[in-house]
């Protein structure tokens, strides 16, 4: 029995019985109180009902208490504060969750969630102008793990990478590759400021020289540009795909911005929005305060972004008449919706925080308020090596690439460490600490817990083979897991699916990492108690019954840690 789900269903049933309203009960929370004296679980249902019925929350809470006290898994119910209902669960109900994990694993990990959403999540979308730098890794890991979580709870998810292959940076890439091509033909070249001086483009010039000889030099400029652009973008995308694959990240779709231009999708989207009365000709208001020298007060085509909460309307054309980047964003969002997505998630870097309102406006307009949109910002990673910050710049050619860091510490460490802070908070990534074998290193601490659980089972198999066979056959008495430490660990194990569900609901993958660190900490504490007091050891040859129960506990811990690591794309370690 999943205690969290069971209590939620019983609260819904009580709401229907008492107030003939089960829909409102679906919005109630079932949480774990921060303080044990407030019980095991707590709900705000009384305050929700009270607001709806215009009655006292405590009066509502008392009625719920009267109905729910009779439930077989409830030990006691207390009313606290303005009307919180605090539940203490019987120990045997918590203990039974161990059996559910071990014997009904698939059912225990199943989450009953709305599966009608077809989610498109766009993340990374780095310009294809060079190897990915470590700054992109946070958004890449966040987006990938969020997608995995959403898939885990049952949503249909498309993982997408938007290829910015139609902007000025691509023109700079082409110019740089052409210089490297001429260099490969024997010319002495200098890479001007503003282009890409990194040596990673030298092989591209050599390939072009080998394939074309000097033909590109005499070719029509437009034809030459097209050939070099297609070649360079594809090579850089191959590089980015490999960098991502080495991090365990694979997108379903790489979508070309250029294709929106080539297929006339921008024109089609503008025509649609014009018909909706959302495109007009006008001038943008001057920036507040001192007039910015780049402010353009010309009459131009604008999208009524302010209709949907944006701070200003947005230009869809540049001064030269070409489509703006925003116009591409309009067409791209429409394309996603036309493909069947009814929930768009954008994962952006800290430098794009100003895009949140405009993206929300785009989706609200094109989705006609029927398509959900969430824009998640990943703050900067402060990458440190031996206490010295590493500057990251493709243009300067001295960035720390994903490949560099992956080679140094491995994908599992990168993936886990990128989740050790909430995505909208800056993250310090210390190369020294992530390689330490100590409790100060969270990935080591969690992996070590997994290894220890396996060693417990191996030790029992070796020292107590008959008892181990009984354990595998499910012959254990879980009521023996009665110490405070054991019950607290069991409560935490029982909350695993609740944590997973919350991670999906709030788009917060870091909750998984935090949960695993907490579980590992509690397990290691109990392990250390066993060093001081043999009664706390997991394998006690003189007490077969208690050993059987603790083998079940160790196995449940192992399964939940493995499940958590699998969700975030980290390989559980069997030995260290």
Curated annotation (Swiss-Prot):
InterPro entries: aa-tRNA-synth_I_CS (IPR001412), Arg-tRNA-ligase (IPR001278), Arg-tRNA-synth_N (IPR005148), Arg-tRNA-synth_N_sf (IPR036695), ArgRS_core (IPR035684), DALR_anticod-bd (IPR008909), Rossmann-like_a/b/a_fold (IPR014729), tRNAsynth_Ia_anticodon-bd (IPR009080). It catalyses: tRNA(Arg) + L-arginine + ATP = L-arginyl-tRNA(Arg) + AMP + diphosphate. A motif ('HIGH' region) lies at residues 126-136. Disulfide bonds: none annotated. Pfam families: Arg_tRNA_synt_N, DALR_1, tRNA-synt_1d. GO terms for molecular function: arginine-tRNA ligase activity; ATP binding. It comes from the Bacteria. PANTHER family: ARGININE--TRNA LIGASE, CYTOPLASMIC, ARGINYL-TRNA SYNTHETASE. This is Arginine--tRNA ligase.
